[in-house]
Amino acid sequence: MKLCVALDLSTKEECLQLTKELKNLDIWLKVGLRAYLRDGFKFIEELKKVDDFKIFLDLKIHDIPNTMADACEEISKLGIDMINIHASAGKIAMQEVMTRLSKFSKRPLVLAVSALTSFDEENFFSIYRQKIEEAVINFSKISYENGLDGMVCSVFESKIIKEHTQKNFLTLTPGIRPFGEKNDDQKRVANLTMARENLSDFIVVGRPIYKDNNPRKICEKILQEI
């Protein structure tokens, strides 16, 4: 299980400072939509200069198939290690993205977003007319069949996804509150024990790390646990 630290701070300077504090730790960094829009692709280069961190660019790409493939191709030129697209974009979009990325000698891992961890059952059903678990199983089967590397899901769907695909089909699980911290805007949250029991491959932790007075110590504690 790998730790992915979410760089969701208010400024680029704060993100870079956090990154410097975490230098030499065996972690991934997650760059989200706000940071990428604010700081651009040069921010990725700056992160790579701090240390040889693996970068997950969390843009949740969702558009028509050709536009998605174009976007993923451009992102791949930046040396990104992992990206994500929305599973609800469908199998044609998935196929176009994977075909386009196949020309790279070292392409990024591509994950599909299933049900955002900010959803509870009621709100999810109001949009998709399905229970979360049913939709996630369907999304994961389509993603697996069309060559993606894994899924973004809550901890509670991770094991189910592997049961309906393969054990090596990756799961990245946001909404991790490692030591029982408050949920904030997340609905389907879990701790480290739950993540381990449900076979998560990557856990995403943000606020419990960067809001702490000693982010490095928290990261080290998490790494010891996993």
From Swiss-Prot:
Active site: K60 (proton donor)
Associated pathway: Pyrimidine metabolism; UMP biosynthesis via de novo pathway; UMP from orotate: step 2/2
Entry keywords, A to Z: Decarboxylase, Lyase, Pyrimidine biosynthesis
GO annotations of cellular component type: cytosol
BP GO annotations: 'de novo' pyrimidine nucleobase biosynthetic process; 'de novo' UMP biosynthetic process
Keyword Lyase: yes
Annotated signal sequence range: none
Top-level division of the source organism's lineage: Bacteria
Catalyzed reactions: orotidine 5'-phosphate + H(+) = UMP + CO2
Alphabetized PROSITE patterns for the sequence: OMPDECASE (PS00156)
SMART domains tied to this protein: OMPdecase
EC number of the protein: 4.1.1.23
Function per UniProt: Catalyzes the decarboxylation of orotidine 5'-monophosphate (OMP) to uridine 5'-monophosphate (UMP).
Subunit structure: Homodimer.
Family (UniProt): Belongs to the OMP decarboxylase family. Type 1 subfamily.
Name by which UniProt lists this protein: Orotidine 5'-phosphate decarboxylase
Gene source species: Campylobacter jejuni subsp. doylei (strain ATCC BAA-1458 / RM4099 / 269.97)
